[in-house]
Each structure stands twice: as structure tokens, then as C-alpha cells.
Swiss-Prot record:
Residues of the DNA-binding region: 37-61, 89-112
Segments forming domain HTH myb-type: 9-61, 62-116
Protein name, per record: MYB-like transcription factor ODO1
Molecular function as annotated in GO: transcription cis-regulatory region binding
Induction (UniProt): In fragrant cultivars (e.g. cv. Mitchell and cv. V26), increases before the onset of volatile emission at the end of the light period, peaks at night and decreases when volatile emission declines early morning; this precise expression regulation of its promoter is tuned by EOBI and EOBII binding and activation to a MYB binding site (MBS) 5'-AAACCTAAT-3' and by LHY binding and repression to cis-regulatory evening elements.
Length: 294
């Protein structure tokens, strides 16, 4: 809820005060003193609100009120208070007896602010304006100098030198990359060859066939191969050719059953229905030729 209104707005007079209203308000306050401003209009016989009575007394009718412009001492005090309090005019007016906050604010905006600007002082921060101007000009001057230097460098350095420098850097980069790649590939190949040599050496030591194939001097064909034998194996003496032949049976004894079937022809096995006349004639001629030579 907001503040309650000081009076009923019905029947309240607005606008400038008359001389009769000023006399009634002055006589009431001088005889009764300052009291609740909401009750003053009814007690003094005025058709005004309490706020209007208070402002009229404070700003225009009180006896200690000073008229006219502020003195030099008052202006210095206002500047000092404004640097510490800012635009809190009511607090500044409390330090200046006989002066109202509205009067001090009007005097500040019309007179004191212009004096401070002429003196080169900022009326808001109360600091010299030259320092701020110098600080604001420094980055602009530095940027302008950098732009000018960069423009001069671009004009002095020709375009061909930039191209050649870029080409030189690119060729150096390519050479370095190719050298590093070749070095890495050679290292990898050397590592793989060393590993393969170790593997082949181990295999050749364990396997006589591989050791024979990997030898620089080829061995004679007639030289016997010596394979590793375990301790449990026994070496048999070589047998003579006559003993091998005597143990073998004759071909006739072994394949005696085959000679009995040599006399059969194709018709005996029932193949006459499987072949045509031409094929049968071929088989007959083959049999006749074999019988002749046999």
C-alpha cells in the first residue's frame, strides 16, 4: 500500500498562491509553530493540501530564507558538497542555512556548471578535462602510428620478394618433410631386415634343409644329408641289392589273377550295349592287334 493522500482532492484549490493565503499561513505558523502539515490547511482556513502548504512555507515564506544569488563562499561549499554527495540537493541544502534545495539546484545548473567547464573541470567527476582528453587521444595516436608504419612497410617491400620468400619457405618445408619421411622409412626397413635376419638364422640353425639352401657354396649332390636323430633311434645297416631282389616275389606270382582275365573281351563284360558299332569296331581292332603282337 502507498502513502495515504494528505487531503481529499474534492474542493482543493490549485494554482499560484495569493497574498491573502500567504498571510493566513504565516500568521498560523508564527502563532502555533510548525505542526502536522496535513492538519494545517483546516486549522489555518485554507483550501490547500498539506504538501502545498509545506512547500510554500519552506521555499518562499519562512523568515530566515535568503534571497538572491549564492555568494562565492556558498558556491565553493556547494562544489565541495557536490563532489562528495552528488545530486542530493536536499542534503546539500541542509548544510546551507537559508537556502532551499530547489534554489541550489537551479543555481548549479545555470551558473556553477558553466564556471567549472570554463576552468577545465568536469562538473560530474570534478577532475580535469585535459587528462581525459589525453587518455582518449593516446590509443588513437598509437593506432594511427601502427597503421602508418604498416602502410610504409607494404610500400617498401615488393611483391616479388614476398612470393620468393613464401616459395623458399615452402621448399624448405617440403625438403624437411621428405628427409624426415626417408629417414623414417630407412629406419623401418633396417628394423625389418634385422628382424628377418634373426628369424632366418634361428630357422637355419634348427633346420638342415634351410641351412643348406642358405649357404653361399652349393654342396655336392652326392654328399649325404645328415639329419638330426634322437638318442632313441637306431641306425640300420644298408642292405645289398641282391638281398632286396631275393626278397621280392616275381611279377607272375603276384599278379597271377590278372593273366586269367586277359582272354576276356568286351562282350564278356556286357559292354556291347553301352557302345555303338563304330566304337565296338575300334575295340575289336585293338584286340586283334594285341593278339598279333602277343
Amino acid at each position: 500500500m502507498g502513502r495515504q493522500p494528505c487531503c481529499d482532492k474534492l474542493g482543493v484549490k490549485k494554482g499560484p498562491w495569493t497574498a491573502e493565503e500567504d498571510k493566513k499561513l504565516i500568521s498560523f505558523i508564527l502563532t502555533n509553530g510548525q505542526c502536522c502539515w496535513r492538519a494545517v490547511p483546516k486549522l489555518a482556513g485554507l483550501k490547500r493540501c498539506g504538501k502545498s502548504c509545506r512547500l510554500r512555507w519552506t521555499n518562499y515564506l519562512r523568515p530566515d530564507l535568503k534571497r538572491g544569488l549564492l555568494s562565492d563562499a556558498e558556491e565553493k561549499l556547494v562544489i565541495d558538497l557536490h563532489s562528495r554527495l552528488g545530486n542530493r540537493w536536499s542534503k546539500i541544502a541542509a548544510r546551507l542555512p537559508g537556502r532551499t534545495d530547489n534554489e541550489i539546484k537551479n543555481h548549479w545548473n545555470t551558473h556553477i556548471k558553466k564556471k567549472l567547464l570554463k576552468m577545465g573541470i568536469d562538473p560530474v567527476t570534478h577532475e580535469p578535462l585535459k587528462k581525459e582528453a589525453n587518455l582518449s587521444d593516446q590509443p588513437t595516436t598509437e593506432s594511427d602510428q601502427n597503421k602508418e608504419n604498416g602502410h610504409q612497410q607494404v610500400q617498401v617491400v615488393p611483391q616479388s620478394t614476398n612470393v620468393t620468400a613464401a616459395a623458399a619457405t615452402s621448399t624448405e618445408f617440403d625438403n624437411n618433410s621428405s628427409f624426415s619421411s626417408s629417414a623414417s622409412s630407412s629406419e623401418n626397413s633396417s628394423c625389418t631386415t634385422d628382424e628377418s635376419k634373426l628369424v632366418f638364422d634361428n630357422l637355419s640353425e634348427n633346420d638342415p634343409l634351410l641351412s643348406c639352401l642358405l649357404e653361399a657354396d652349393t654342396p655336392l649332390i652326392d654328399s649325404p644329408w645328415e639329419f638330426p636323430m634322437s638318442s632313441t633311434t637306431t641306425v640300420e645297416e644298408p642292405k645289398s641289392f641282391d638281398s632286396i631282389i631275393s626278397n621280392m616275389t616275381s611279377w607272375e606270382d603276384t599278379f597271377n589273377w590278372l593273366s586269367g582275365y586277359q582272354e576276356f573281351g568286351i562282350n564278356d563284360f556286357g559292354f556291347d550295349n553301352c557302345f555303338n558299332h563304330v566304337e565296338l569296331d575300334i575295340f575289336k581292332t585293338i584286340d586283334n592287334v594285341e593278339n598279333r603282337h602277343g
